[in-house]
A protein has these predicted regions:
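Short, solvent-exposed loop/linker segments at the N-terminal edge
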Residues: 33-39, 131-137
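Exposed beta-strand face motif in extracellular beta-rich ectodomains
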Residues: 42, 76, 94-98, 140, ...
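Short, surface-exposed loop/turn segments at beta-strand-coil junctions that are enriched for proline
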Residues: 83-92, 182-187
Length: 236
């Protein structure tokens, strides 16, 4: 269904969707608009005493584009057509966002519209809350459950807290984190904390934390010297 949002740049921003109640927001306030994953068309009405124009961030132009004029004078409108948010062979159809900036001709008044399209919620989580390894295990593999594509996994981040871990890396698909270290010849177990995270287009961060324990070296049993019992003196 085609929807209309009215923008009054000079004084207030008026938001109206269908027959819903209008919401009045003071000028220069950012506005968030959320639509379903389905393809559709969205229109924005603009009211200002003078000239105005609207622009879109470059990254969003792959799935969202303007139809008709993107500038005017006084009362006017601009229309946005957007694609369905679904798996396209590269992206899984995660939630996404386009950014529109409406600005008056003098450049002194502007409103930013965050145009958000619903989709799959990102998932990144370790398969276990903690991992325990023997003292002589020097390579650790930590599996990660994720619904991100290889392309999207490039924006995953991870952090290792544990100075005894000598090296680490994440696989290109974000499905595994590898840790390397030395044999633990110490008397105490070594503990590291690993966090993996992903921030989506809406600015929400999804994270998971796990604990890695490398056990201490087993203590060798003490060697006891076998003593012969003392010979008793014969009493006569």
């Amino acid at each position: 269904m085609k929807k209309m949002i009215k923008i009054l740049l000079a004084v207030v921003l008026i938001v109206a969707c269908g027959c819903q109640k209008e919401e009045i927001i003071t000028k220069n306030s950012d506005q968030i608009v959320i639509v379903t994953p389905d393809a559709g068309v969205h229109s924005f009405g603009v009211t200002t005493p003078g000239a105005w124009s609207v622009s879109m961030d470059e990254a969003s132009q792959e799935w969202c584009h303007f139809e008709g004029p993107t500038s005017g004078n006084g009362v006017g409108a601009f229309t946005v057509r957007y694609d369905e948010n679904a798996f396209d062979g590269v992206r899984r159809g995660l939630r996404r966002q386009a950014v529109f900036t409406v600005i008056t001709g003098d450049g002194f008044t502007s409103i930013t519209i965050y145009f958000r399209q619903n989709g799959i919620t990102p998932k990144v989580e370790f398969t276990e809350k903690s991992y325990n390894f023997d003292y002589n295990t020097t390579e650790f593999l930590l599996p990660v459950n994720t619904n991100l594509s290889v392309f999207e996994a490039e924006d995953m981040h991870y952090e290792v807290k544990g100075e005894w871990v000598t090296s680490h890396y994440m696989t290109v698909n974000g499905a595994e984190i590898h840790l390397s270290t030395d044999v633990n010849n110490g008397e105490e177990a070594r503990v590291a904390e690993v966090e993996v995270s992903y921030t989506d287009a809406w600015g929400d961060t999804f994270r998971s934390t796990t604990t890695v324990v490398q056990k201490s070296k087993p203590v060798a049993p003490e060697q006891f010297e076998t003593l012969k019992p003392e010979e008793e003196d014969d009493e006569f």
